[in-house]
């Protein structure tokens, strides 16, 4: 039984029912319906912290999904899982792949910036001030692009950019 059919959460059940109705009335292929079911099950597993199960569902959704825009969200969610697991290098790979398919994905840009900022902080702790500045500049570039796409979001990033004098071009 698919995960989406065994949800105990009211909101998840409601989403599942609505999604199932939409899948029945929208003119989509069986392959697209299967891809969406795996994606939905991946999101459900991810929300419950079942990352291995979520990844299995996302990989299956990727195998079936042909639309680049839809694939971008699957890749983004895979990146989120790797970020949560502390696998920042792998997360970056998936965020970059998501952006290749959907350049207007500010959340992926933000998450890339967060990783570069984190690495910059680590470089400071390791006494690598030159490397930290390079990483902070990369973070600033990605945050600026995320803010350009979503000007009312990422307030903390906007404040950091102002405080560090990196807010030029906003």
Swiss-Prot record:
Matches recorded under SUPFAM superfamilies: TPR-like
Which keywords are on file for this protein? Chloroplast, Membrane, Photosynthesis, Plastid, Repeat, Thylakoid, TPR repeat
* One GO BP: photosynthesis
**Species for this entry:** Tetradesmus obliquus (Green alga)
Similarity comment: family membership = Belongs to the Ycf3 family.
Gene3D superfamilies for the chain: Tetratricopeptide repeat domain
Q: How does it sit in the membrane?
A: Peripheral membrane protein
What name goes with this protein?
Photosystem I assembly protein Ycf3
Q: Which SMART domains match?
A: TPR
């Amino acid at each position: 039984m698919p995960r989406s059919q065994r949800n105990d959460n009211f909101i998840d059940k409601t989403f599942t029912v609505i999604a199932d109705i939409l899948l029945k009335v929208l003119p989509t292929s069986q392959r697209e319906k299967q891809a969406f079911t795996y994606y939905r099950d991946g999101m459900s597993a991810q929300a419950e912290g079942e990352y291995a199960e979520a990844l299995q569902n996302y990989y299956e959704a990727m195998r079936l999904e042909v639309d680049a825009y839809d694939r971008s969200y699957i890749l983004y969610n895979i990146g989120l899982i790797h970020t949560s697991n502390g696998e920042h290098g792998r997360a970056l790979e998936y965020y970059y792949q998501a952006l290749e398919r959907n350049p207007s994905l500010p959340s992926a840009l933000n998450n890339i910036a967060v990783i570069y900022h984190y690495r910059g902080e680590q470089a400071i702790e390791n006494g690598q001030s030159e490397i930290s500045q390079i990483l902070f500049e990369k973070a600033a570039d990605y945050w600026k692009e995320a803010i350009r796409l979503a000007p009312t979001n990422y307030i903390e990033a906007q404040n950091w950019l102002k405080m560090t004098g990196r807010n030029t071009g906003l």
